């Protein structure tokens, strides 16, 4: 059993990785040991750990634990780099929609390849990899706090209020979906700590219930005033005038701002547009994929039919008629024209006044980040 304390989904010390089994929350707090990339792949695919930032870090650290134990490795530096690269490629296959995982793998592959060109000892390749993976863990928390700060200040200005802001969020984007603090939920935390949040509403987020099981759990833990609603109640909530904004996370953002996120996000965006409610995406720069012109190119993962056929997101008893077919996409794509702004750790990406479109590439260039994303 693990100690929840600060709501850590990832507990890492060099050579050791434990992941909070989020499938058992909120009724049971249990950590599993991850000793190699295979353990990491299974944990990600089986939803032990989820959330785009968290799975990228969990994958990187799973391999860090594995290579830390390769004291008897006798290959060359080039062979060590190939070993790491192949393991990273394998880990990326665990959940293909989230760009954070593939982005982290690309950067780490590049690092070990460059290191292999100058080092004479294979162990130096592994050490460079471990150091880089550990840096990703530390950076994620600071990036999330920056997202929260930028988002809270922007909402305050955009809504032209200094208190009593109520928002709706979807899925889980907090400490359980990241290395700590959270993205969309990080904005909510910042609003709360700043004394300007009246209430946070969260959806169930069926069929895996990340909202009712995880987000509600985090909000109660942090003593944030919050209310859980059924997914199907969101439009009625917006019509009631009880919320001023919707804030969601992202698994992948295309160059034009189209955003892939948990299934049901598109529904919320359409409802928000109809009811005049502002709709925000909060995500790190690593969630942006400039190689994709639009959301049409985003690969959407399909989950097991059991998540719909059985209760508890597929883990419980059968609730649907035997023989019924199932379509169970894990994500949908929200068009950029439904999104008010995109909140990142480097600031808020807004639309141009001229044509109401995002110019994400220019934003990244102005933040001096573009060269690192090629």
UniProtKB/Swiss-Prot annotation:
Major localization class: cytoplasm
Keyword tags: Amino-acid biosynthesis, Cytoplasm, Isomerase, Methionine biosynthesis, Nucleus
Cell location: Cytoplasm; Nucleus
E.C. number(s) listed in UniProt: 5.3.1.23
Pathway the protein acts in: Amino-acid biosynthesis; L-methionine biosynthesis via salvage pathway; L-methionine from S-methyl-5-thio-alpha-D-ribose 1-phosphate: step 1/6
Reaction(s) catalysed by this chain's protein: 5-(methylsulfanyl)-alpha-D-ribose 1-phosphate = 5-(methylsulfanyl)-D-ribulose 1-phosphate
Induction of synthesis: By iron deficiency in roots.
Keyword Nucleus: yes
Site (Transition state stabilizer): 171
GO terms assigned for molecular function: S-methyl-5-thioribose-1-phosphate isomerase activity
One Pfam short name: IF-2B
Active site: 251
GO biological process, one term: L-methionine salvage from methylthioadenosine
Enzyme class: isomerase
Gene Ontology CC entries for this record: cytoplasm; nucleus
Keyword Ion transport found: no
NCBIfam families, per database record: eIF-2B_rel (TIGR00524), PRK05720.1 (NF004326), salvage_mtnA (TIGR00512)
Job of this protein: Catalyzes the interconversion of methylthioribose-1-phosphate (MTR-1-P) into methylthioribulose-1-phosphate (MTRu-1-P).
UniProt family annotation: Belongs to the eIF-2B alpha/beta/delta subunits family. MtnA subfamily.
Entries under HAMAP family matching the protein: Salvage_MtnA (MF_01678)
Protein name, UniProt field: Methylthioribose-1-phosphate isomerase
Organism taxonomic ancestry: Eukaryota, Viridiplantae, Streptophyta, Embryophyta, Tracheophyta
Gene from which this protein is expressed: IDI2
